Structures are given as C-alpha cells and as structure tokens.
C-alpha cells in the first residue's frame, strides 16, 4: 500500500465517527487530522507505548482519540505500513475539555457508552489527572498558567 493511500484510509476511518456530529465536527476533524503533522508522526515514529491509558488535556472533540482508534483498527486488519511500528493499543482514552460544545460533539461521535473513550467537561488546570501512562496536550499548552 502506498503511503498516501494508507494515510487517506486512516483519515477516512478517523473522521467517520464525526459525521454524526454534523458538518462542522466532520470537516474540523478531517482538516485537523490531515493538516497537523503531529498526528501522523506520533504513529510513524512510535512515540506512544504499545499499550497505554491516555489522558488528553484540552482534547476538543476527541480527534486524537478517533485517530488512535482508527490506527489500531487498520493495524489489526493488516492495513499498516511495514516500516512503521505497531499502532498503540489504547486501554483507556480520557479527555478533559473546557468547552461544552466540543464535549457534546465528542459524545455524538463516540456515543455515551464507548468502552474506551470518556471526554468530560472541565478545566485542565484544576482537574484530577488520575494515573494515565500517556498525557497529551495538543494545541492547549498556552492555557496553563506558568505559576
């Protein structure tokens, strides 16, 4: 499989859950996942452990989680680049997001009873992080007070 074909398949798979959230949610996910190289590079470089509980601070509508779930699905189906490390296997995907509209879009995309995904409305400056193995903060670091 050509790299561009693989990335298109991954993008299609990761964007699909957001169709239920409307045009904005879907097109936002596609735009974000296709234009921000961090999503591709965390997989290509194997930056996450093989299995992990994730916490994404300022997670928005959960685009990273959709990306990780889609990656694992393609990997398990054998549709994965031979020169890339295995896709990580999420054990739990927890997000903290300040904006309720993003939390609502995530609930539309993943459903209320998703076995791995839980996105809650809250302030990442005061939230209990729990005990995840991986903490990500994409596009939200500037919301942390440096004190």
Language-model regions, residue ranges each:
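Class I SAM-dependent methyltransferase Rossmann-like catalytic core
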Residues: 11-45
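Conserved SAM-binding strand-loop segment of SAM-dependent methyltransferases
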Residues: 113-124
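Conserved SAM/SAH-binding beta-strand->alpha-helix loop
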Residues: 99
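Conserved SAM-binding loop
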Residues: 106-107
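A conserved beta-strand element that flanks and buttresses the S-adenosyl-L-methionine
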Residues: 136
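Conserved class I S-adenosyl-L-methionine
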Residues: 52-60
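A short, conserved alpha-helix within the catalytic core of class I
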Residues: 144-147
């Amino acid at each position: 499989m050509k790299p561009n074909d693989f990335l298109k398949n991954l993008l299609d798979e990761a964007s699909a859950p957001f169709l239920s959230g409307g045009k904005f949610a879907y097109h936002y996910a596609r735009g974000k996942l296709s234009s921000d190289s961090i999503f591709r590079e965390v997989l290509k470089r194997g930056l996450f452990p093989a299995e992990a509980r994730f916490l994404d601070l300022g997670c928005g509508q959960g685009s990273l989680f959709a990306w990780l779930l889609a990656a694992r699905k393609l990997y398990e189906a054998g549709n994965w680049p031979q020169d890339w490390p295995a896709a990580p296997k999420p054990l739990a995907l927890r997000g903290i997001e300040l904006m309720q509209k993003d939390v609502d879009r995530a609930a539309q995309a993943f459903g209320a009873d998703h076995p791995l995904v839980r996105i809650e409305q809250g302030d990442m400056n005061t939230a209990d992080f729990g005990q995840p193995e991986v903490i990500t903060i994409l596009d939200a670091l500037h919301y942390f007070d440096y004190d």
